[in-house]
Amino acid sequence: ALAKIHHSNKIRVVMLDEGVIGEYRVRDLKPLAARFGEQIIDAKGISTLPEETRKTLISSNVKIRENGISLLLNPATAYYSSRLAGEREKTVESAIQLKEKLGRPISVADPYCGVGPAVVQLLAQQGLVGDLLATDINPEAIIMLKRNLGEIKESWHCKATDALKLNQNPKLLGRFDLLLMNLPHSTLQHLSQLLPLLKTNAPTLLRGWYIVEEEEIPSAEAEFTNIIRQTQTLNSNFKLEIRRQFNTTKVLTRFECRFGDW
C-alpha cells in the first residue's frame, strides 16, 4: 500500500476491499495508507489521528466518469457497479426511441436507483425526461443521488423508499412511461408490485435485469410472461437475453418489453 501511494501523487488513500456486506451490499473498506499533508502514513498512523481528521482523510467519496457523465459515489455507503454501464447506455437509446414515439418528454421510474447512474444519464439528454421517480431503500444512496441530480423538480419523487411500498401511493399508479427493474437477484419476485406504475393507455417500456441459473431460463421466461400479462399486453414473446456469466452456473440476463402500439 505504501509503495502504491508513493508511486502516484494522485492517490489520496489506499483501501483494502474485504467484499460486500449488509443488506445494502456496500463495500467493506479498510484504510491501508493515506496522504496526510507532506507525509504518507500507514494504517497505524491513520488510527492515531483525531476522529474528524481521520474521517476526512479516509473518506471513500469518489467522482467517476461513466458514458460521458460525472457521478459522485461512495462504495462504502451505497452500492454501485460499473458492470452495467453498457446496459445503461442502451437504456438511453431505448428511452429516446420511446420519446420519439410519444412525441414528448417521457416519465421515468427507477425504483432501485442507487446513486443515480441510470437516471443521470437519461437526464443528460436534452428534453428526454419530464417526470421522474428515483427511489432506493438505502438512505445514503439517496443523499448521493440528490448530489448527482443537482436541481430536483418539486413534482419528482426522489426519496428513500422501499420499492415494494410504491404501489400503495395512488399518485404513482399509471404515471410512468418507462420502468427500470434493476434488482437482478429479486426482479422476478418484485415485478408484479412495480408494474402498476406504468401507464396502460399509451406506448410504454419495461427494461430489467435478472440473475438466474442458465438451465432455468425457459421456466423463468414463462413466469415473467404470466406476471406481465396480469396488467399489460405483450407485443412479442418475453425473452431473457444472456449478458454475461455471473458465476459457474448463473447468468445475468436482460429483458426489454414494449407495450402498446410501437
Model regions and ranges:
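SAM-dependent transferase fold signal centered on methyltransferase-like domains
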Residues: A1-W262
